Amino acid sequence: MKKFLALALALVMALSLAACGKKADDNNKGNGDEAKGSVYYLNFKPEADKAWQDLAKTYTEKTGVEVKVVTAASGQYDTMLTSELDKSAPPTMFQVGNQGAVNSYGDFCYPLDNTDVMKEMTTQDFNLKNANGETVSIGYCYEAYGIIVNKALLKQAGYEITDITNFESLKKVADDIHARANELGFDAFSSAGLEGSSSWRFSGHLANMPLFYEFRDDNVTSQPATIKGTYLDNFKNVWDLYTTDSATTGAALTTATGDTSEAEFGQGKAVFFQNGSWEYANLVTSDDKGFKMNPEDLAMIPIYCGVEGEEKSGLCCGTENCWDVNKNAKEEDIQATLDFMKWVVTSDEGTTMLAEQFGPCPFKNAKTPENVFFADANAYTAAGNYIVTWAFNWTPAVDDWRAGVVDALTQYTVNGGSWDNVKTAFVDGWATQYAKENG
């Protein structure tokens, strides 16, 4: 943790990256030779699909090299990646975002040490390696998430951002706004939808809170076979708040999508919206969405959940965005992919897109993003607040584990089930998935 915080301050913000692997045996790969093959990128983030499609088109126009971008549906990346890698024309470029995925996909990952794209990196300290010590997955951006706040609406309700410093004060403000929703014309929280395009925010990102604090207390430094669920009551605190102080409650949560929640916030119908720095472009600059929110009205605060000392917490910082190259692809396609990756991180077009869509990137030519959420993350760190790292990167069989948590949350929230079922899905589900993944 000390090393992490030190690096975070040195880099302005932490870069918590993930990876996978195989031995580097051809140092000529990615050293600038003209690619003769083609690129097939299986993209992880639906919200960045248009940006990647546009960039791919630009690269093809400039070089003549075909770049195909396919984007998996939210929550379906692992399933689609497994299927696509088995095809005769598999992805040449894909994403592996945590240590568990290293175990699953390591045999497909090309060693990236000594390639040009890796030489462009400003830090390699958080690039994960395989069992042989080879770097096979590089993190291309750093992200932060928390509770996004519409400060203008908050002020209309009679509050300032400084009034919220912990769970108690967050609940007090949210309860009051919800009670006056008809009068104010807006509610406290946007929909905490349990539909697939939204549920990852809670089975993954909100679930990180109890995992982070448990791992911090127990000095966990590698993927554990079991967890205790020490802070699940704190998870419940926030979940109950999200699903009570909102216009969308009960059965409606099962069909509320990520777009639904985003639109409620973007259209000024809610003060609070749990999401991340990647939402900035959608909220502020997107012509497609049409929100065009004023950046000065936006802020991001920590996810407060009632843990002692949380007044000194910062935002949740890290990344699941890590590039991998398919070592089983054709030689010319591997070369084309490495050349494309280098162009993305060095060209004006590529670095502009990365800054706008993803924020801070660990490359020499990276542009400084205008994203106000990173300014908030920096401010918390500069004030000495601790960073809430991405403990969920150690989740075993992540899609299956999260699906179990979502099912239990649905039973609890919609059907009046017991919170004990959520605890079972969380704790026992972890042990079950770990055993399946590790034999």
Model-based region annotation:
Residues G97-V149, R201, H205, P295-P302:
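Hinge/lid segment of periplasmic solute-binding proteins
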Residues T58-Q124, A152-G158, T165, E264, ...:
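Extracytoplasmic "Venus flytrap"/periplasmic binding protein-like
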Residues D113-F126, G193, L211-N237, D287-M293, ...:
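Short, solvent-exposed loop/beta-turn-alpha elements that line the ligand-binding surface or hinge
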Residues V136-Y140, Y145, K171-P224, A270:
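Extracytoplasmic/periplasmic solute-binding protein
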Residues G139, E356-F363, N378-Y434:
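C-terminal capping/gating helix-and-loop segments adjacent to ligand/active sites or protein-protein/ligand interfaces
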Residues K62, Q156-A157, D288-E356:
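Extracytoplasmic/periplasmic substrate-recognition and gating elements
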Residues A174-D175, T221-T255:
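Glycine-centered hinge/linker elements that transmit conformational signals in sensory
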Residues E84, P91-T92, M118-L154, D187, ...:
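A structural signal for short loop-to-beta-strand junctions that line the ligand-binding cleft
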